[in-house]
């Protein structure tokens, strides 16, 4: 298994003010793993149209678990799969296909809704030598259309086009058609903070109009691109940009996490860690939650699922768990 940490970034506090608190409650102990089994670093969380929850986490190997809508364990998907090396994200598309983004194998894998068939692989897993993935920390190779380097997330538009955050090395977003053929890209291996530049695009979502939302983690901003990957705007005042999530439904919302970064001193836990609910234009609706090690707090929100904007699933990289939260009416 590839053992590599992400780049270290300084803590960035949210600067937005006057955002109301949203009433919420946690659902303690919602997920029920198999007896004697535990989650590791919980990298990805996703739901399908039936309410089943998928959790992609790091243990002695990358593992993808499926739970039903009550939190009961159903199955493990992809056990022993060649593309599972160092989990990073899982998403479910509108046809309920399951997509696993693996940072270690440099791949994005598409599985059938029941997880029984592998339907597509984007990227290329380097050869394995002595049980270790032989990858590099730089571009792999630089600026190619089909080779990824430590990808971080995946999303789709209404036409089925595929968007990949090619995150840790290549600092870009790549667009493919529904069959995996290259269409466009923005960004590049060189880190930057200007227009059409990224410093670790870590999270990725697409709304019903085809706009692309990028959690540009190293730049502590959320970048909005049009469907052709042309720059539109950025939201810069919501702190550390780890995760972005766009809800379903006629009125969509953008949820972003001001996550508490790895190694952040405990003294700052009371000022970081909120999840913000935004209109798609960046206008804040409210915020909830706080950083901490004990439920219902969280320690480094890595990914979120918000298919239902009133029920969020949150995956934590440092507390090795996933939690369910319900937003309540005031």
Residue map of PLM features:
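Eukaryotic scaffold repeat domains enriched in small/polar residues
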Residues: 9-330
């Amino acid at each position: 298994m590839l053992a590599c940490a992400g780049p270290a970034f300084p803590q960035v506090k949210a600067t937005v003010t006057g955002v109301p608190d949203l009433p919420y409650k946690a659902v303690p102990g919602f997920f029920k793993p198999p007896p004697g089994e535990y989650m590791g670093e919980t990298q990805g969380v996703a739901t399908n149209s039936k309410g089943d929850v998928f959790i992609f986490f790091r243990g002695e190997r990358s593992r993808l678990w499926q739970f039903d809508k009550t939190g009961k364990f159903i199955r493990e998907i992809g056990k022993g799969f060649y593309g599972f090396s160092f989990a990073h994200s899982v998403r479910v598309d509108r046809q309920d296909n399951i997509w696993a983004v693996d940072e270690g194998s440099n791949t994005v894998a598409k599985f059938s809704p029941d997880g029984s068939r592998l339907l597509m692989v984007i990227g290329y897993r380097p050869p394995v030598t002595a049980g270790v993935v032989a990858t590099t920390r730089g571009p792999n190779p630089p600026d190619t259309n089909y080779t990824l380097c430590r990808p971080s997330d995946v999303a789709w538009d209404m036409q089925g086009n595929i968007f990949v955050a090619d995150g840790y090395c290549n600092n870009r977003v790549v667009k493919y058609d529904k069959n995996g053929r290259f269409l466009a890209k923005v960004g590049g291996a060189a880190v930057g903070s200007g227009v059409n530049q990224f410093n670790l695009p870590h999270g990725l979502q697409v709304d019903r109009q085809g706009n692309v939302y990028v959690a540009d983690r190293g730049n502590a901003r959320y970048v909005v691109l049009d469907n052709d990957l042309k720059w539109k705007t950025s939201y810069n005042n919501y702190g550390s940009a780890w995760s972005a999530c766009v809800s379903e439904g006629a009125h969509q919302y953008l949820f972003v996490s001001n996550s508490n970064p790895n190694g952040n001193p405990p003294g700052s836990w009371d000022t970081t860690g909120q999840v913000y609910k935004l209109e798609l234009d960046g206008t804040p609706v409210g915020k909830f939650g706080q950083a901490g090690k004990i439920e219902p707090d969280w320690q480094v929100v890595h990914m979120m699922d918000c298919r239902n904007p009133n029920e969020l699933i949150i995956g934590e990289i440092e507390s090795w768990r996933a939690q369910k939260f319900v937003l309540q009416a005031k």
